[in-house]
Structure formats: structure tokens, C-alpha cells
């Protein structure tokens, strides 16, 4: 029954949209558009994917998505950070994980083990500053870029 199929498809969080058409006498044409995961949210003991539109998708072990960055906490705040990162053309493929703190700020852990400690406010300025300095030879040996104190960069 077409309604049963539609009900099952609606319950699947990976599906963005779908259409089901009955072609008589005995054929169904089903078109499914999947959501696109951008990160894995680790929320306490549960895992979800976060889609490119900010939706939560029930986690499944999918080979194609195993290397997505992991978000620890702050799932509802992550999407706005993600959009800002895209807007400033931050190289998202460099980010291994995101850590959200209850104070309302983020740490970004990069694949090269560099850590960017962002302030609560005006973190776009800090991210742009990191983009300008990350390839500078004077900054190569530093692993921690701490922007938490306004108008200061603490390197470690």
C-alpha cells in the first residue's frame, strides 16, 4: 500500500524528500532525495549526523561519512558556526573535531593537531586571523592558538 510506504519513508531521518507514484497495474516509482551529513554529533552517549541544513539525522555506520568531523556538545549551536565557517571560506576539511563549552564558546581541533580556542563573541575575527597566520613560518611550531581574551592571541 502506497500510504504504508510513505509512512515508513517519513520516519526515516536520512530522507530530505520523496515522491511515490503508482504506475498501474503493478509498479511503484519512488524517488528519494537524501540529506547531506556535514558532521557527527556526539551528544552524551548518542550519536547523530548533522545535515547541511542543520537537521539531526539518526546515526548509522556509513563508510562514506566515517571521516566527518565530530561535534562534542552544542549541536544546536553548531550549525550557525558551520555557516560562518563556510562564509569566510574556512577550509572545513582541515577540522577534525569541534568542542562546545557550556560557557558558549568553541574549540576547533585540526587534523595537524593545532587547536583554535575561540572566544564567546566575535569569533569570526579570530578565525580570519588564524587563516592569515596558519601558514606563516613564525607560527609553524605552535599548536594552540588561544583567542579567548579580547585583542590577544596566546600561542603555545
Cite the ranges covered by each PLM segment.
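Charged, solvent-exposed interaction patches on well-folded alpha/beta domains
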Residues: 2-156
Amino acid at each position: 500500500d502506497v500510504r504504508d510506504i510513505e509512512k515508513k519513508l517519513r520516519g526515516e531521518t536520512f530522507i530530505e524528500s520523496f515522491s511515490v507514484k503508482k504506475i498501474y497495474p503493478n509498479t511503484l516509482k519512488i524517488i528519494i532525495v537524501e540529506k547531506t551529513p556535514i558532521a557527527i554529533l556526539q551528544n552524551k552517549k548518542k550519536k547523530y549526523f548533522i545535515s547541511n541544513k542543520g537537521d539531526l539525522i539518526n546515526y548509522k555506520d556509513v563508510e562514506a561519512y566515517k571521516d566527518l568531523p565530530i561535534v562534542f556538545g552544542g549541536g544546536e549551536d553548531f550549525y550557525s558556526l558551520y555557516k560562518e565557517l563556510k562564509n569566510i571560506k574556512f577550509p572545513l576539511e582541515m577540522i577534525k573535531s569541534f568542542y562546545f563549552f557550556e560557557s558558549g564558546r568553541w574549540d576547533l581541533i585540526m587534523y595537524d593537531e593545532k587547536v583554535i580556542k575561540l572566544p564567546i563573541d566575535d569569533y569570526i575575527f579570530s578565525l580570519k586571523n588564524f587563516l592569515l597566520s596558519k601558514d606563516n613560518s613564525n607560527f609553524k611550531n605552535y599548536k594552540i592558538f588561544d583567542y579567548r581574551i579580547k585583542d590577544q592571541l596566546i600561542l603555545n
